[in-house]
Swiss-Prot record:
Database matches in InterPro entries: Urease_beta-like, Urease_betasu_sf, Urease_subunit
Principal place of residence: cytoplasm
A cellular component annotation (GO) from this entry: urease complex
Domain of life, source organism: Bacteria
CDD domains: Urease_beta
Membrane-spanning segments: none
Family: Belongs to the urease beta subunit family.
Biochemical pathway: Nitrogen metabolism; urea degradation; CO(2) and NH(3) from urea (urease route): step 1/1
Organism: Pseudomonas aeruginosa (strain ATCC 15692 / DSM 22644 / CIP 104116 / JCM 14847 / LMG 12228 / 1C / PRS 101 / PAO1)
Catalytic activity: urea + 2 H2O + H(+) = hydrogencarbonate + 2 NH4(+)
GO BP annotations, alphabetical order: urea catabolic process
Gene (UniProt): ureB
Protein name: Urease subunit beta
Length: 101
């Protein structure tokens, strides 16, 4: 192997395999763009985003790590969420959970 070389197995990599997902419509009711990162607890996003908030407790966007989704003012779009893994504890963000899910 050459230093810095990647040794990638053939085939596709499936993100978040085996985790529960949820598709829902989200609308930006505000007057400014809102961007949500890949690992942000969706239940706690900006209140100007309108959606079924209770259904999203313990979930995040089902997108690649380090990426984000941007919601322009007045825009509605479908997103897919995935369960938060690991210890299923949420701290910080908007402070709405601060503990176990």
């Amino acid at each position: 192997m050459i230093p810095g070389e990647y040794d990638i197995q053939p085939g596709d990599i499936e993100l978040n395999a085996g985790r529960r997902t949820l598709a829902l419509s989200v609308a930006n009711t505000g007057d400014r763009p809102i961007q949500v990162g890949s690992h942000y607890h969706f239940f706690e996003v900006n209140d100007a985003l309108a959606f079924d908030r209770p259904a999203t407790r313990g979930m995040r966007l089902n997108i690649a790590a380090g990426t984000a989704v941007r919601f322009e003012p007045g825009q509605s779009r479908e997103v897919e969420l995935v369960e938060i893994g690991g210890g299923r504890r949420v701290y910080g963000f908007a402070g709405r959970v601060m503990g176990d899910l």
